[in-house]
């Protein structure tokens, strides 16, 4: 087991820079099966990705299993802007982002009839978007990238035939890159940070057909030390940049029902305290031309709203080797118009997904396809912007997830 844990730890470090999302802050594409069911997969049998969806369900795993997953995320979107305040959108463009990849790796071992241990690395938060560098919306942001990855370790215990619980620790990594042109002058900010979090989960089975579960994930407070470069027509300079941001806590509630030995359904609701993201203030080191001026803080209020995500998924076993899955999910919009910007330009989201799985005694292979319909987002002018108002519209994301699990 130690060999597998060390390998997974090393992989987490190597994969971290690639663990990014698309047009949202929150990522749920942790496995092909989970994505195929809309993220409603808290009670799966013998699935190592339970480490991500519901650690209390590690107790549903027999023996020792390892799983790897990768999600291909291709976002698309258009913008239009009012440049002179006449209520006419007279400039337009599109999200120019390249497709992103969100990997996940999981390892679970049953210690005895009562105890399990699991380890996983996956992306809980992430964002990546790009717009035309010389467009007017570049004054808000023409490139933003938040690479996020979590490395978690959980202990799970089956207390009796009805109760299972789990508790775990998390190391959360965030890498931030932001490029914008406030008042038309290029600014580049880049930094990385690590912080600790924790989680707890519990399942209760009413009988062999009905089960409920709850998962709590703690907030994670990051303090970033980075660097910046700023260019004006008269001079260019750089230095240190510092900022704090708190990634929000969440509660996930799930219900699972087995219609028979071949068909089951899950419902999931997740509440996220997005109001933790109330500001993204950055403090810059003194300018080299006037070091006596002291550090300069640039406030960036966000004031996001708490929100819910609802999902329903169904899984049907076609034979002893093949299963099919389908799901639908709805994410509420947490970004108010007054504080929206092109750093995270996403509205409410509806996701539709399908998947298929092959399984035998030694392995499972799964493929999921999905389409995410992203709602419009209106934006008002903020300090440094050279437009009066703007709007993201006609946004959508295509997603493909592939997973492979090996049973030792």
Language model: regions and residue ranges:
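Residue-level signal for pocket-adjacent positions within structured domains
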Residues: 20-22, 32-39, 46-47, 53
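Gram-negative bacterial Sec-dependent N-terminal signal peptides
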Residues: 1-21
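Surface-exposed strand-loop-strand hairpins of Gram-negative outer-membrane beta-barrel proteins
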Residues: 39-46, 75-98
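Outer-membrane beta-barrel pore proteins
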Residues: 42-45, 49-64, 107-114, 159
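Transmembrane beta-strand segments of Gram-negative outer membrane beta-barrel proteins
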Residues: 26-41, 59-78
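Outer-membrane beta-barrel porins/channels
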Residues: 23-35, 86-92, 100-408
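Beta-barrel outer-membrane channel/assembly domains of diderm bacteria
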Residues: 12, 55-58, 71, 84-91
């Amino acid at each position: 087991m130690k060999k597998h844990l060390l390998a997974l730890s090393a992989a987490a470090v190597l994969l971290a820079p690639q663990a990014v999302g698309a047009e949202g802050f929150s990522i749920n594409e942790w496995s092909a099966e989970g994505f195929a069911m809309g993220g409603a997969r808290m009670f799966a049998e013998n699935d190592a990705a339970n480490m991500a969806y519901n650690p209390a369900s590690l107790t549903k795993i027999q023996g020792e299993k390892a799983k790897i997953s990768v999600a291909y995320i291709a976002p698309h979107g258009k913008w239009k802007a009012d440049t002179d305040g006449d209520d006419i959108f007279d400039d337009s463009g599109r999200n120019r982002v390249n497709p992103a990849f969100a990997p996940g790796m999981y390892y679970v071992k049953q210690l005895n009839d009562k105890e399990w241990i699991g380890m996983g690395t996956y992306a809980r938060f992430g964002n990546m978007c790009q717009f035309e560098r010389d467009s007017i919306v570049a004054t808000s942001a023409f490139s933003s990238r938040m690479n996020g990855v979590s490395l978690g370790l959980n202990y799970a215990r089956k207390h009796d035939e009805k109760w299972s619980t789990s508790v775990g620790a998390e190391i959360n990594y965030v890498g931030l890159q932001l490029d914008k042109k406030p008042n038309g002058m290029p600014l580049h900010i880049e930094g990385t940070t690590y912080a600790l979090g924790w989680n707890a989960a519990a399942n209760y089975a009413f009988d062999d057909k009905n089960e409920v579960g709850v998962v709590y994930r703690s907030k994670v407070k990051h303090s970033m030390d980075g660097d910046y470069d700023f260019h004006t027509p008269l001079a260019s300079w750089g230095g240190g940049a510092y900022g704090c941001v708190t990634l929000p806590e969440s509660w996930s509630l799930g219900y699972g029902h087995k219609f028979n030995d071949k068909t089951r359904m899950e419902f999931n609701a997740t509440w996220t305290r997005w109001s933790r993201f109330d500001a993204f203030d950055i403090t810059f080191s003194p300018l080299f031309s006037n070091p006596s001026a002291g550090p300069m803080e640039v406030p960036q209020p966000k004031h996001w709203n708490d929100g819910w995500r609802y999902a329903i998924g169904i899984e049907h076993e076609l034979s002893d080797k093949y299963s099919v899955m389908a799901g639908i999910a709805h994410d509420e919009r947490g970004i108010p118009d007054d504080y929206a910007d092109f750093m995270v330009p996403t509205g409410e989201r509806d996701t539709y997904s399908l998947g298929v799985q092959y399984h035998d005694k030694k392995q499972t292979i799964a493929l999921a396809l999905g389409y995410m319909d992203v709602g419009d987002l209106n934006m008002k002018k903020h300090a440094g912007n050279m437009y009066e108002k703007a709007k993201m519209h006609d946004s959508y994301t295509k997603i493909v997830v592939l997973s492979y699990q090996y049973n030792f």
